[in-house]
Design a protein with these regions (language model features):
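N-terminal alpha-helical "arm" segments
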Residues: 1-56, 340-343
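Short, flexible beta-strand-to-coil junctions
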Residues: 73, 77-78, 82, 225-227, ...
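Sequence/fold signature of self-assembling virion shell proteins
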Residues: 2, 43-54, 237-343
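Surface-exposed polar/charged interaction patches
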Residues: 14-21, 48-52, 56, 69, ...
Length: 343
């Protein structure tokens, strides 16, 4: 093996953090390389560790350790990059209580009723009031697995660079799903003036909700591409520049002075029939307010394997994390009932 373990861990972290579609060069050591070059180097190095069954059996604990260290370092950073605009993300040691300290502003003390929505047992979401200035986010184990066919492995058609990529993507999507579930679960707890449902996009309804959220600070709109594409003012108000922006981007990135943040969308499975994020919801959240989503990572990632009867292997990964939402009466929700999560 040309690289020692610490160098291989660094390489794996660099590859896992990189954007495969970007043309930029990434630093490794004292040189810069393209993503394709780094990824191919990682594949070559891992083949030297597990290119045959005997090598895999000899080195699997080293491989698992590399995967664990990579996930522990890269996953929180990826989550931060994607969700930091509306989520607070912290990492805790195993056994430490994930505690988030709440910033209580004068207006919050005067007007904001605070409560927390978290995941309960059997997927039931519980709502309870927040006492004091801290909240604890309970964590639980989230798992992902990548199956490696024994013959595919021996033939070299599957390698551990693929395994790492599949696991990272799966854990990231699991977090995204939990965020969406937690946000959806808060809607029933909001007061009636802070939420509205329409069959389509109604400009006056959105303006009313923005006015409520803006009384606590300039608000930002968070929604999927599908929802953003419907947010078009009355025809008489559309300028040529807005038409060009809509044509080029598919949506307007600014609605009457308020930024529109488009959330990533994907499908639950390969059938492409059910979306991960329900596109009918838009969340209007004041900038500078407490970020409503709290994400806690606890302890180290654990990687192990399970051998099936056909000798195929499942590389299983467990990571403890928790997602909760802190809801105040400065958050508003618009539901466009014309949009559905199913196709």
């Amino acid at each position: 093996m040309a690289l020692n373990k610490s160098e291989l861990v660094k390489l794996a972290k660099t590859v896992a953090s990189a954007n495969p579609t970007s043309q930029v060069a990434y630093s490794f050591g004292e040189e810069k390389f393209s993503y394709a070059d780094l990824n191919e180097t990682l594949r070559t190095e891992l083949r030297e560790l597990a290119g045959t069954y005997s090598l895999y059996r000899e080195n699997k604990n080293t491989i698992f350790s590399i995967i664990e260290e990579t996930i522990d370092d890269v996953l929180p950073k990826k989550v931060m990059e994607q969700y930091a605009s509306f989520a607070e993300i912290k990492t805790y040691a195993q056994g430490d209580k994930p505690i988030f300290t709440q910033r209580i502003t004068a207006s919050a003390k005067r007007r904001a009723k605070r409560f927390v929505t978290k995941v309960g047992l059997a997927g039931i979401y519980e709502v309870f009031k927040l006492d004091g200035k801290t909240l604890e986010v309970p964590t639980e184990a989230f798992g992902g697995a990548a199956q490696i066919g024994f013959e595919e492995f021996l033939d070299g058609r599957v390698d551990f660079a693929d395994v790492l990529d599949v696991i990272m993507e799966g854990l990231d999507e699991a977090i995204y799903i939990e965020i969406e579930k937690a946000l959806r679960a808060t809607i029933d707890s909001l007061q009636d003036t802070n939420k509205a449902s329409e069959t389509g996009f109604v400009e006056s309804t959105m303006d009313n909700l923005i006015g409520i959220a803006d009384s606590y600070g300039k608000s930002t709109i968070y929604c999927t591409y599908e929802f953003a594409a419907t947010m078009v003012p009355a025809q008489g108000w559309v300028s040529d520049d807005m038409r060009n922006q809509k044509w080029n981007n598919g949506y307007l990135a600014n609605y009457k002075g308020h930024n529109v943040i488009v959330l990533d969308q994907s499908f639950v499975d390969e059938t492409n029939t059910k979306k991960v994020i329900d596109p009918s919801y838009a969340y209007i959240i004041p900038v500078g307010a407490d970020k409503p989503v709290k994400i806690a990572f606890e302890g180290n990632t654990i990687v192990d394997e399970y051998v099936n009867k056909d000798r195929s292997r499942e590389v299983q990964v467990y990571k403890k994390l928790g997602v909760a939402t802190l809801v105040t009466n400065n958050i508003c929700v618009y539901v466009n009932e014309a949009l559905t999560p199913s196709i």
